[in-house]
Swiss-Prot record:
Its main location: secreted. Residues 61-172 form the Expansin-like EG45 domain. GO terms for cellular component: extracellular region; membrane. It comes from Oryza sativa subsp. japonica (Rice). Belongs to the expansin family. Expansin B subfamily. This is Expansin-B13. Pfam families: DPBB_1 (PF03330), Expansin_C (PF01357). May cause loosening and extension of plant cell walls by disrupting non-covalent bonding between cellulose microfibrils and matrix glucans. No enzymatic activity has been found. May be required for rapid internodal elongation in deepwater rice during submergence.
Length: 228
């Protein structure tokens, strides 16, 4: 019975989004959420799309360029974010804690979600359009009034650099779109490469030899480092 109730309420939420998707913006987006905002809770709105317990398509490149978002580290707990959350791609991979604002109707327990795509539905200053799995983990009855909290930790990336083995020079990459970064160079670069990421708060995170010699395109290499 609880599962049926959740599914029904989720469909109602999705219908509300459809009703406001046409015409000029109804609610302007709020200011960008930054690392300096702190741990205050903000009022937001959450909607749901896809299968009731969906974790996203296997090849869900979206606006961030991620794939296999149903697998680690995302595990389907993902969301599209509007402008102040997506931030022209710089919000890709950011983590948020979200919870329902009505304790009697919801678990009132924060759940962790990742930003993997964008949305432009003008329904709230802060709008999360969640995968079904993430939505169900948060709300028992699908209430669309939510509170959100920026997770402690500075995760928005503003610069990515790489360094060849044996070199002291860090070479800056250019942001192509979303979470996709590239480097244009007249000569081949030789791995392994160390990667240095600068966050919005100024933290520099270095992953030594994160990309091996003989690397291949469309491959994943784990760094085992993260923002504090």
């Amino acid at each position: 019975m609880a599962s049926s109730s959740l599914l029904l309420a989720s469909v109602v939420v999705a219908a509300m989004v459809s009703a406001v998707s046409c015409g000029p913006p109804k609610v302007p987006p709020g200011p960008n959420i930054t690392a300096s905002y702190g741990d205050k809770w903000l009022e937001a709105r959450a909607t749901w799309y896809g299968a009731a317990k969906g974790a996203g398509r296997k090849d869900n490149s979206g606006a961030c360029g991620y794939k296999d978002v149903d697998k680690a580290p995302f595990l389907g707990m993902n969301s599209c974010g509007n402008d102040p959350i997506f931030k022209d791609g710089k919000g890709c991979g950011s983590c948020f804690e979200i919870k329902c604002s009505k304790p009697k109707a919801c678990s009132d327990k924060p759940v962790l979600i990742h930003v993997t795509d964008m949305n432009d539905e003008p329904i709230a200053a802060y709008h999360f359009d969640l995968f079904g799995l993430a939505f169900g983990a948060m709300a028992k009855d699908g209430k669309d009034e939510e509170l959100l909290k920026y997770v402690a930790g500075d995760g928005d990336v503003v610069e990515v650099e790489i360094k060849e083995k044996g070199s002291e020079e860090w070479k800056a990459l250019k942001e192509s779109w979303g979470a996709i970064w590239r480097i244009d160079t007249p000569k081949p670069l030789k791995g392994p490469f160390s990667v240095r990421v600068t966050t919005e708060g100024g933290e520099k995170i270095i992953a030594e030899d994160a990309i091996p010699d003989g690397w291949k395109a469309d491959s994943v290499y784990k760094s085992n480092v993260q923002a504090k």
